[in-house]
Amino acid sequence: MKTIYCLLAAAAVLAVLVGCQAGNTPAALNSNTNAESANNTNAMKFPYHLTEDEWRKKLTPEQYHVLREAGTEPAFTGQYWNTKEPGVYRCAACGAILFKSDDKFDSGCGWPSFSDIMAQGKVITREDYSYGMHRTEVLCANCGSHLGHVFDDGPAPTGLRYCINSASIQLQDTNTPGWNTDKTAEKK
């Protein structure tokens, strides 16, 4: 009996851990949403870009791994996975406003989940076939940094779940003066 409980517990943990790693590619993203598609961000020019050495100096090791190497932080460990604080979420690499707390919801996957992006053109997407899966990767449209993935199992009205790494975003209180000013700077 103890073995059965251990197996059930292990299966439950595994299901949670892969919650943001698998899913259907959102059909809505392939046709029309607030995201713009890109097939190869390495060849793209972004308004804000640094050399990889500059990124390493600017970001923490965890941020660099997630944002620049398309890494994933462990589930239920990130700073924002369960926060309910109001505000906007900015790209941790360049400061672009990406998401608002009104669109954040508890998906149970262990990463911050949003049903929509702040505005059209804030993120871009590309197909991701890593780890033997087909997913849709989400990147900052301003600097090309990896944010997470988007799936088609989110709440109405969008039906989308933007599963985002905490290390890739920073929460800013909207009661702070100047919260909505563009903190990004073009670096060429």
Residue ranges of each PLM-predicted region?
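Bacterial N-terminal signal peptides that target proteins for export
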Residues: 1-8
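Hydrophobic helical h-region of N-terminal Sec-dependent signal peptides
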Residues: 9-14
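C-terminal motif of bacterial Sec signal peptides marking the signal peptidase cleavage site
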Residues: 16-19
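Bacterial signal peptide processing site
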Residues: 21-23
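Post-cleavage N-terminal segment of exported redox proteins
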Residues: 25-27
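N-terminal low-complexity, Pro/Thr/Ser-rich intrinsically disordered segments
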Residues: 29-57
